[in-house]
Swiss-Prot record:
Keywords: Cytoplasm, Isomerase, Rotamase. PROSITE patterns: CSA_PPIASE_1, CSA_PPIASE_2. Its EC number is 5.2.1.8. It catalyses: [protein]-peptidylproline (omega=180) = [protein]-peptidylproline (omega=0). It holds the Pfam family Pro_isomerase. This is Peptidyl-prolyl cis-trans isomerase B. One of its GO terms (molecular function) is peptidyl-prolyl cis-trans isomerase activity. It is found in: Cytoplasm. One of its GO terms (cellular component) is cytoplasm.
């Protein structure tokens, strides 16, 4: 069996193991892995300074919508931040939002991917062709963590959790 690439989001609510899909979205997976491991330079939106810090460590899931998705990856933690660059979408004909627990890029329209991502908690077919899918939650334990985060009480105006859900670190490994 061929080796697979995994990213584990270690959160204050438990671990979410994700099987990444580099054969379907190679640029997106590379961007995510390099930001997660400190191998890609990014610009801190708060200071304007270049950084090779691990972007996702210490960030929060800033937007949580029960029955839909959980969103994170913003270095500012409010939905407005990113890495200081944007890149194109990668849509693969074999991938659509026909099942829950998919990892995809959040964006503000075509070609605006950066660092923000979301995990779905239900099929969301209307997102197919609008957001790059680049992974899927690989096990029942991680799916339960995603579901628990999605059920977190939020501010009804902003969809932000009332208590921070923190991505403490991201571990990337091939196995």
């Amino acid at each position: 069996m061929a080796e697979q690439l995994y990213a584990t989001l270690k959160t204050n609510r438990g671990d979410i193991e994700i099987r990444l899909l580099p054969n379907h979205a190679p640029k997106t997976v590379r961007n995510f892995v390099e930001l997660a491991t400190g191998q890609r330079e990014w610009v801190n939106p708060e200071t304007g300074e270049k950084s090779t810090d691990r972007l996702y460590d210490g960030t929060v899931f800033h937007r949580v919508i029960s029955g839909f998705m959980i969103q994170g990856g913003d270095p500012l933690g409010n939905g407005t931040g990113g890495p200081g660059y944007k890149f194109a979408d990668e849509f693969h004909p074999e991938l659509g939002f026909t099942q829950p627990y998919l990892l995809a890029m959040a964006n503000a329209g075509p070609g605006t991917n950066g660092s923000q991502f979301f995990l779905t908690v239900s099929p969301t077919a209307w997102l197919t062709g609008k957001h790059t899918i680049f992974g899927e939650v690989s096990g029942e334990a991680g799916r339960k963590v995603v579901d628990a985060i999605a059920a977190t009480p939020t501010n009804p105006r902003t969809d932000r959790p009332l208590e921070d859900v923190v991505i403490e670190s991201v571990v990337v490994e091939t196995r």
